[in-house]
Amino acid sequence: MPSGIAESAVRKIAASLAVLLAEVFALYLKTKNFHWHVSGPHFRSIHLMLDKQASDLLAITNPIAERARAIGGNTLRSIGHTARLQRLADNDAEFVKPEDMLAELSLDNRSLAIRMRAAHQLCEGRGDTATASLLENWIDETERRNWELLESTDDVGMSFLVGCPVSAGSRPGPCYQPNYGVAPPSAVAMYFV
């Protein structure tokens, strides 16, 4: 292995990075979707914030993939591969209220941060300090995005999101249930460890 990390650890770490990469791509596209389709009195501020957040997400895709390759693992190969690994739900609704956009992105960022922490723990436990260090930065960026979304919610009447629980292997609980005519996705177990 190019990194000196045990082959079994490389497989697990690369698999966790592939899932994170799929999640980041899914969140990037959802963020751009909402950036393109937001409307209402807070259009400009939300539109600009979401554009910046989408750019930040896209900026970490290459480092995630290249880190998997640098340790001797593989990464995503196609849109289909991405779709099979992503856990964040897509949102194909024709209309989403701005407050629901912010709420959904907030919960998705929180879920992503939880998964990143699980990957960080995996890396630390397998002696991959470099990947763990990169994940620390990505966790910080994800928490910052969530903070921006939460701070923006007060302007559109969504202070109820503070304290909404999210667990590592599931979608958010009953504190927020948007109704897009689609049933919420079922809980999924994480398989990083």
Q: What label would you give each PLM region?
A:
Residues 42-81:
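Conserved alpha-helical segments that form or flank metal/cofactor-binding pockets of metalloenzymes
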Residues 171-173:
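Basic polycationic patches enriched in arginine
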Residues 4-12, 27-52, 117-130:
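Helix-loop segments that flank and shape redox-cofactor active sites
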Residues 179-192:
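Short, intrinsically disordered C-terminal tails of secreted or membrane-associated proteins
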Residues 1-20, 98:
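Disorder-to-helix initiation segments
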Residues 66, 80-137:
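Acidic/histidine-rich alpha-helical segments that form the ligand environment
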Residues 21, 28, 35, 54, ...:
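A structural signal for well-ordered alpha-helices, especially hydrophobic packing surfaces
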